[in-house]
């Protein structure tokens, strides 16, 4: 039994999803009385220059590098066992050894496919439990290593794929992907309509444009949607200040039809009142949409995990996938006018959702390490406190 375990969560800043999952798990551990939790961007700390370059190339995959990313993602999948594993296993190894020596963690969790820890276990025989928390609705071989003790995955489909690859079924737990706790609260939506000046009697289209310009032609799209009767368009620009300023001018022509926001801290509030959402198919965003049963229109998924995510949600009937700019307006307008289709998509989202994934993961890890959680009450956000 470990009395006061130290938990090390390894992650990486490729998109916000991996880090967000790490922070959600950290918060969940702390809520259960586990105070000694460290979150580390291993690659960023080990090789900052290489990491910055690869992050830049990752973002460019949304615009000019799709074929390059396709070759990388699917090519590495094919040759991983033979050529890539030995190189990748040593990436971040020096920093990792120093970190393990200094912090002496009892538990290691990966929210990014970092195999340096299980490879170190294999080579040195160190005894430390390693857990991989997969952050998409698919699996790449780079996540898999014999020295990983347990995998937490989004769906039974992912589990089946992993079993087919050769991972023992008993090592895989279907939990869903950890999401922010705010997405799992029960909140009366009336105050949300007032807060964002939205109308309960109109359809609401949420466009999550993102900070990196990954959603094209947003201005033109907004102008087109503003002509649709009984529709309000809400655009979240994130930290893309240039896009926000560009759209503010459009908003001024009809402030009731278009609402423009920068970074929205409590974006779950907008999820709760939207009729459907245009977004990119990241694993975390899709998990949050599933939690609140938001039908999604997935915009031009990049080859790789985004495309795999999109195809899964499309097969399940929870998403409409857009692969060409010319389709966005027509397909979105048609969906907004089809209440039966929207209801079916909501039901499909409900079937995908797994409640309280972070709690499930943390409870499983603590139980396997014979740790008794000591729950610490956490105050609910003010909006949730307004309704009981």
Swiss-Prot record:
Any one GO biological process: glycolipid biosynthetic process
Entry keyword Transit peptide: no
Gene: ugtP
InterPro entries: Diacylglyc_glucosyltr_N (IPR009695), Glyco_trans_28_C (IPR007235), Glycosyltransf_28_UgtP (IPR050519), Pro_diacylglycrl_glcsylTrfase (IPR023589)
CDD domains according to UniProt: GT28_Beta-DGS-like
Record's function text: Processive glucosyltransferase involved in the biosynthesis of both the bilayer- and non-bilayer-forming membrane glucolipids. Is able to successively transfer up to three glucosyl residues to diacylglycerol (DAG), thereby catalyzing the formation of beta-monoglucosyl-DAG (3-O-(beta-D-glucopyranosyl)-1,2-diacyl-sn-glycerol), beta-diglucosyl-DAG (3-O-(beta-D-glucopyranosyl-beta-(1->6)-D-glucopyranosyl)-1,2-diacyl-sn-glycerol) and beta-triglucosyl-DAG (3-O-(beta-D-glucopyranosyl-beta-(1->6)-D-glucopyranosyl-beta-(1->6)-D-glucopyranosyl)-1,2-diacyl-sn-glycerol).
EC number(s) from the headed UniProt entry: 2.4.1.315
GO CC annotations, alphabetized: plasma membrane
Organism: Bacillus anthracis
Lineage of the organism: Bacteria, Bacillati, Bacillota, Bacilli, Bacillales
Protein name: Processive diacylglycerol beta-glucosyltransferase
């Amino acid at each position: 039994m470990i009395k006061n375990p130290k938990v090390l969560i390894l992650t990486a800043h490729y998109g916000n999803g991996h880090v967000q999952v790490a922070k959600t798990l950290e918060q969940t551990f702390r809520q259960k009385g586990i105070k000694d939790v460290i979150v580390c961007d291993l690659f960023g700390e080990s090789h900052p220059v290489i990491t910055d370059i690869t992050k830049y190339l990752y973002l460019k995959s949304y615009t000019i590098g799709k074929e390059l990313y396709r070759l990388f993602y699917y090519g590495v999948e094919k040759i991983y066992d033979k050529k890539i594993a030995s190189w990748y296993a040593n990436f971040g190894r020096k920093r990792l050894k120093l970190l393990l020596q200094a912090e002496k963690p009892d538990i290691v969790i990966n929210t990014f496919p970092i195999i340096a820890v299980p490879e170190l276990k294999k080579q040195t025989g160190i005894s430390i439990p390693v857990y991989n928390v997969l952050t998409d609705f698919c699996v790449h071989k780079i996540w898999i290593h014999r020295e990983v003790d347990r995998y937490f995955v989004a769906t039974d489909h992912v589990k089946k794929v992993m079993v087919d690859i050769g991972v023992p079924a008993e090592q895989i737990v279907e939990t869903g992907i950890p999401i922010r706790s705010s997405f799992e609260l029960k909140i009366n939506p009336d105050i949300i309509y007032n807060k964002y000046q939205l109308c309960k009697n109109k359809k609401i289209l949420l466009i999550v444009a993102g900070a990196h310009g990954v959603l094209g032609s947003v201005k033109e799209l907004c102008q087109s949607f503003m002509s649709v009767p009984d529709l309000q368009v809400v655009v979240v620009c994130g930290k893309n200040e240039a896009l926000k300023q560009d759209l503010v001018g459009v908003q001024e022509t009809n402030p009731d039809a278009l609402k423009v926001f920068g970074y929205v801290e409590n974006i779950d509030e907008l999820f709760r009142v939207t009729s459907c959402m245009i977004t990119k198919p990241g694993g975390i965003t899709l998990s949050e949409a599933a939690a609140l049963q938001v039908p999604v229109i997935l915009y031009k998924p990049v080859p790789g995990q985004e495309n795999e995510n999109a195809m899964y949600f499309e097969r399940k009937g929870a998403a409409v996938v857009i692969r060409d700019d010319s389709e966005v307006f027509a397909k979105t307008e048609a969906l907004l006018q089809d209440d039966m289709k929207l209801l079916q998509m909501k039901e499909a989202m409900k079937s995908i959702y797994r409640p309280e994934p972070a709690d499930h993961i943390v409870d499983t890890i603590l139980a396997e390490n014979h740790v008794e959680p000591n729950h610490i009450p956490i105050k609910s956000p003010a909006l949730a406190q307004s309704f009981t």
